């Protein structure tokens, strides 16, 4: 069962867990855990995607309950009329607030995009970011005797593939758990000592104008146990009040590791 964050006669939003595909593709034909099919079975009607979240990213996923609703939502996303807010845990201390305007070359998958043009130039990519908190933990990583982490709020103004992950890597503050654009030593250390065994990127909030009622609509997604344990271990509880959960499974292993 997926957590339903919002539902009316036109729209439904769920809290997508990390590791779940939004929908099947021919590359993942045998995947059994898929958001769209699960939601369809859960609410008893078809759903229509309007946007996507990467498989390792968790958080708000908004869908239409008709093809028209899906189309209208997709149109709002394409025209950048929907405000998206994410939170991430990154390597190092990212403390400033700024806008990064750094064009990105399109990332092509060798199989899925084998017929796509490879000569496209960099595409505009803009992200507003704000450092919320920092911590230094007494755990050696690489040649450093301690490990530094930062909690960051992100608002992408464009929608390029892996934009937030690539922009933070460009800033030399990659997201913890990012196996493609991140720091592998930091990823291993975070997983071993603090239970950060996923991409620490969460789609916390969507704000939009309801396409049928015209009313403002804001949807928040709560954090999972991995996130809540990280906030506790790093002394960051209370910094994300709209997303933190009152109850969560407390860590039972050493150094914040979850027992299996």
From Swiss-Prot:
Q: Which UniProt keywords apply?
A: Isomerase, tRNA processing
Offer an example of a GO molecular function term for this protein.
Answer: RNA binding
* Superkingdom of origin: Bacteria
- Under Enzyme Commission nomenclature, its number is 5.4.99.26
Protein name per the record: tRNA pseudouridine synthase C
Q: What does this protein do?
A: Responsible for synthesis of pseudouridine from uracil-65 in transfer RNAs.
Gene3D superfamilies found in the cross-reference section: Pseudouridine synthase
Q: Where is the active site?
A: 54
Question: Sorted alphabetically, which PANTHER family does this protein's record hold?
Answer: MITOCHONDRIAL RNA PSEUDOURIDINE SYNTHASE, TRNA PSEUDOURIDINE SYNTHASE C
Lineage here is: Bacteria, Pseudomonadati, Pseudomonadota, Gammaproteobacteria, Enterobacterales
């Amino acid at each position: 069962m997926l957590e339903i964050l919002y539902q009316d006669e036109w729209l439904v939003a769920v809290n997508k867990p990390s590791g779940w595909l939004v929908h099947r593709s021919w590359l993942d034909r045998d995947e059994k855990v898929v958001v769209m099919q699960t939601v369809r079975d859960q609410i008893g009607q078809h759903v229509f995607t309007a946007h996507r979240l990467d498989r390792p990213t968790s958080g708000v996923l908004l869908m239409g309950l008709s093809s028209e609703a899906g189309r209208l939502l997709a149109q709002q996303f394409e025209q950048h009329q929907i405000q998206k807010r994410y939170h991430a845990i990154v390597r190092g201390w990212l403390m400033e607030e700024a806008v990064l305007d750094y064009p990105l070359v399109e990332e092509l998958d060798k199989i899925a995009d084998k017929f796509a043009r490879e000569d496209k130039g960099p595409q505009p990519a803009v992200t507003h970011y704000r450092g919320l908190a920092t911590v230094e933990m007494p755990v050696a990583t690489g040649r450093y005797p301690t490990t530094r982490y930062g909690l960051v709020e992100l608002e992408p103004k464009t929608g390029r593939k892996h934009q937030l992950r690539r922009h933070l890597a460009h800033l030399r503050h990659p997201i913890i758990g990012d196996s493609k654009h991140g720091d592998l030593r930091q990823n291993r250390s975070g997983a071993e000592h603090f239970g950060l065994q996923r991409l620490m990127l969460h789609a916390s909030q969507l704000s939009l104008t309801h396409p049928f009622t015209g009313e403002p609509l804001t949807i928040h997604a709560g954090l999972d146990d991995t996130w809540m344990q990280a906030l506790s271990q790093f002394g960051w509880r209370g910094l994300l009040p709209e997303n933190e959960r009152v109850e969560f499974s407390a860590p039972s292993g050493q150094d914040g590791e979850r027992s299996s």
